[in-house]
Amino acid sequence: MKISRQAYADMYGPTVGDRVRLGDTELWIEVEEDHTHYGDEVKFGGGKVIRDGMGQSQRCDDAVMDTVITNALILDWWGIVKADVGIQKGRIAAIGKAGNPDTQPDVTIVIGPGTEIIAGEGKILTAGGIDPHIHFICPQQVEEALMSGVTTMLGGGTGPATGTNATTCTPGPWHIGKMLQAVDSLPMNIGFLGKGNASLPEALELQIKAGVIGLKLHEDWGTTPASIDNCLTVADQYDIQVAIHTDTLNESGFVEDTLAAFKGRCIHTFHTEGAGGGHAPDIITACSKDYVLPSSTNPTRPYTVNTVDEHLDMLMVCHHLDPNIPEDVAFADSRIRRETIAAEDILHDMGVISMISSDSQAMGRVGEVICRTWQTAHKMKVQRGLLPEDQERGADNFRAKRYIAKYTINPAITHGIAHDVGSVEVGKLADLVLWSPAFFGVKPACILKGGMIAAAPMGDPNASIPTPQPVHYRPMFGAFGKAASATRLTFVSQAALDAKIGEELGLDSPLSACKGVREVRKRHMKLNDACPHLTVDPQTYEVHADGELLTCEPATELPLAQLYHLF
């Protein structure tokens, strides 16, 4: 029996050779492999395949999945693949062909009476996003981020304190303990950064043992060469990551002095372009170093006609500056440079800047990491055309893989949590996001947290079916009760795990320690490992990579924007 390619796609989703447009962007991805079998696909519904004795087996052993996502198009750094995905005990158990091995050939994912089905036909499946630059200013950020497709948040803070409004630090054992207790039942994986600004080790060691996953150096607390060296020395001893916001004013040294203080040790440089803070005007040159793991924050993603004006106002508020003080205004002006922001777009497209994050409520929007990543990819496609790696295929597969890695696997590797999260791979926590292609990158169809549906668009609860208006994002059962704690992870240091802080604080959530952090280098950043020689002209701020000028025009309109939102 034969059916048309269009009819097949309508019924089971796209297959090898089909192309899918991502939202209203100019990005197209092509299916590379299909692990389902033509004629033996499984699908749920009246008169469909997953019924007793057909696609559903009688088995109830350990091989049977708790949940199967059928016929999904997986988009991840490692490939663009059509497959069924099996989930067991909250983790991804298998990727392949689902069904009943008693009636179908080559089944690798067993469906039984105890299996729930989520229809992935015609949908794109991605890993939950990881935002590694969070100011924990308010708990409502968690819901906002979750509804956008983010399932892991790393950063620091204690609420709307003046220090937290400006810096991503949860300082001291008492605050760390209280914040660990506060997030224990939130439907989000969370890891906290302690304050790393100290010239002696003891205060940093106390914070690591109290439960942070890393330390943050911030210029507002004094990011001097001495504090950098001390913080990295302690981090090496405890195998944790250090994140840094460098010295915009160049008071304690220039970018060369900061790089010298790193001494070749790995470090996560926040908003490495510099608008979010850092040595003016040339912190962007740090991207050249193999030991620097660079990220952007989303307000400069991508460069548009509104970017510069918006940033000046944001900066005055976030860093407690006074518009009546000339020195404060000069400080703000020094950080916002059209030339380096334009170059940032291109450096992302070249795979030089490895990650994208939010800088939530502190010059960044927690719910826009994913959409701004894809807006950047779209802008670069329009302005620069296909990447060399995509020329033969004629679709944007490599570019799509490069950009999705920026908010999934690369932050996971950087912070030593890739054994648990960051990709759609067997053994990892089933933090998964389903998207309708028309809404890709901006409005998820379903968000799974640890194998349970934690959030989704839902219609009137009193309606006779799930779809009547008003449809809006609502927390689902995975976000309530003890299930919320059981399907999330709190990321800590191995020292904190050894100190049994979970028992000491009475935490319900499982704890997971970061590992293998200090060996990470830029070459480990998936599809984003380029290290060209970068220079910044101190007068014009023009950026060159290996002698080539990096510049582009600001966007006047973007996809994934007003078309999808009423306000």
Curated annotation (Swiss-Prot):
Limits of the Urease domain: 128-567
Active site: 319 (proton donor)
Residues bound to Ni(2+) 1: 133, 135, 216, 359
Residues given in the record as substrate binding sites: 218
Names of required cofactors: Ni cation
Post-translational modification (record): Carboxylation allows a single lysine to coordinate two nickel ions.
Record's subcellular location: Cytoplasm
Residues the record lists as N6-carboxylysine modifications: 216
Similarity comment: Belongs to the metallo-dependent hydrolases superfamily. Urease alpha subunit family.
GO BP term (any one): urea catabolic process
Subunit organization: Heterotrimer of UreA (gamma), UreB (beta) and UreC (alpha) subunits. Three heterotrimers associate to form the active enzyme.
Enzyme class, broadest EC rank: hydrolase
EC number: 3.5.1.5
Keyword terms: Cytoplasm, Hydrolase, Metal-binding, Nickel
CC terms in the record's Gene Ontology section: cytoplasm
Catalytic activity, as annotated: urea + 2 H2O + H(+) = hydrogencarbonate + 2 NH4(+)
Cofactor binding summary note: Binds 2 nickel ions per subunit.
Naturally occurring in which organism (per UniProt): Marinobacter nauticus (strain ATCC 700491 / DSM 11845 / VT8) (Marinobacter aquaeolei)
Protein's recorded name: Urease subunit alpha
One Gene Ontology molecular-function label: nickel cation binding
Binding site for Ni(2+) 2: 216, 245, 271
TM stretches of this protein: none
Pathway(s) served: Nitrogen metabolism; urea degradation; CO(2) and NH(3) from urea (urease route): step 1/1
Gene3D superfamilies the UniProt entry points to: Metal-dependent hydrolases (3.20.20.140), Urease, subunit C, domain 1 (2.30.40.10)
InterPro entries, A to Z: Amidohydro-rel, Metal-dep_hydrolase_composite, Metal_Hydrolase, Urease_alpha_N_dom, Urease_alpha_subunit, Urease_AS, Urease_asu, Urease_asu_c
